[in-house]
Amino acid sequence: MPIRAGSLLIPDSDLSIAFIKSGGPGGQNVNKVSSAVQLRFDLEGCALLDERVKARLRRLAGRRLTDEGAVLLIARGERSQEQNRRDAEARLAALIEAALVEP
């Protein structure tokens, strides 16, 4: 599902989602269900963003930027995959929107 960030629509081809097991509270279910979400955004491969926006996004991403040039967000605060996916997508959209603002 594409992610809307301001006036941009980030296509699925620039995103990948993996579901992983989440630790912490949640009862026995937490050890059986992969409810945490890893959302990866291919920043370097994204054709929608110009180089200035990419540079700002690299700065904003900080340690969430991988060596391959992808932004990696992990959401594990909720008990369901769907809620964690929405959280990760909202955080990515907020990062991109912040990078779109020229200083």
Where are these regions (language model features)?
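Ribosome-associated translation termination/rescue signal centered on the conserved GGQ peptidyl-tRNA hydrolysis loop
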Residues: 1-103
